[in-house]
């Protein structure tokens, strides 16, 4: 039990002694496990729920067992986190980044790696045959051969991430820009030829040509490209909503304001409604976990996902500067 029960030990010991148990139980007190930049107090959580700031006690920004499960944390990752923290009588706080480290380590070889476009812009391959679709083999997880492979449809019109194209790129930008050649992951080399904008100057289409001899992502003449980007077939893609979560507490300003109220992060939830995913996602079920290539780990939301309306919660981003203490 936790340290506040330490004062009750004499009474506890007296009861056990007087009952003359042949194998008397022992009471051991230890400090509570606190996490940085999260809300754990029931009084505060209740207020967040009542004010509609979170959508319930299982809101993925909270750290209740129900919330962690909904967000996509596995039992194994939580157990590993507790093991790393250890048991102590000294009051201390564990870095939330350690919990994120544990779920990354648990999922990196378990979760299928699939392509999802969170902020899509259309990519048109001008010299690709009109109306043609070909199926390309893609490994589900290079770290786990047991997960096998799948086939992904490729065609003339694709979606790529908007951030993977720039008209006037800075130095060391190796993705798509006019005149540059990149690799479409597990597909072909493509060379950007330009873009189309709407009346407001926003890019609505990127155009390119492909090298038919580079199928699989390698060129027979041995030429190299520095950029590799992911994609999905525009016609056969699955539409989904994706929720990106950050800590509910503003890390820089601390947990509490001067008046004792919580210092909430206004950007703790970002909802993306126009995401495009490869067609294999259509079979996803509640609590299924995936790695979105180049994005992070995601879990199908059990509460808001409906037939034909997929909702994903980001469990954790793909990379972090956190280093496990020795």
Model-derived regions, located:
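Catalytic adenosine-cofactor/nucleotide-binding cores of aminoacyl-tRNA synthetases and other
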Residues: 1-326
């Amino acid at each position: 039990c936790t340290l506040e029960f330490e004062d009750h030990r004499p009474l506890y010991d007296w009861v056990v002694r007087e009952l003359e148990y042949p194998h008397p139980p022992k009471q051991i007190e230890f400090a509570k496990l606190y996490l940085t930049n999260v809300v754990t107090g029931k009084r505060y959580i209740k207020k967040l729920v009542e004010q509609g700031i979170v959508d319930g006690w299982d809101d993925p920004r909270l750290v209740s067992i129900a919330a962690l499960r909904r967000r996509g944390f596995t039992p194994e990752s939580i157990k590993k986190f507790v093991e790393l923290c250890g048991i102590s009588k000294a009051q201390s706080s564990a870095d939330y980044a350690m919990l994120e480290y544990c779920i990354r380590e648990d999922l990196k070889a378990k979760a299928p790696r699939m392509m999802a476009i969170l902020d899509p812009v259309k990519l048109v391959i001008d010299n690709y045959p009109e109306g043609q679709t070909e199926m390309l083999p893609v490994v589900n997880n290079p770290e786990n051969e047991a997960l096998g492979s799948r086939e992904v449809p490729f065609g003339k019109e694709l979606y790529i991430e908007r951030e993977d194209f720039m008209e006037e790129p800075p130095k060391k930008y190796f993705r798509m820009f006019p005149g540059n050649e990149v690799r479409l992951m597990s597909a072909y080399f493509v060379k950007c030829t330009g873009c189309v904008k709407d009346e407001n100057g926003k890019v609505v289409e990127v155009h390119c040509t492909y090298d038919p001899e580079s199928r699989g992502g390698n060129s027979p003449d041995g030429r190299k490209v520095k950029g590799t980007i992911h994609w999905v077939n525009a016609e056969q893609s699955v539409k989904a909503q994706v929720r990106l979560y950050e800590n509910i507490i503003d890390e820089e300003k601390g947990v509490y304001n001067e008046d004792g109220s919580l210092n909430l992060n206004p950007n703790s939830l970002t909802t993306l409604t126009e995401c495009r995913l490869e067609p294999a996602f259509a079979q996803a079920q509640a609590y299924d976990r995936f790695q979105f290539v180049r994005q992070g780990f995601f879990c199908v939301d059990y509460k808001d996902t409906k037939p034909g309306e997929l909702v994903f919660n980001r469990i954790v981003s793909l990379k972090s500067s956190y280093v496990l203490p020795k």
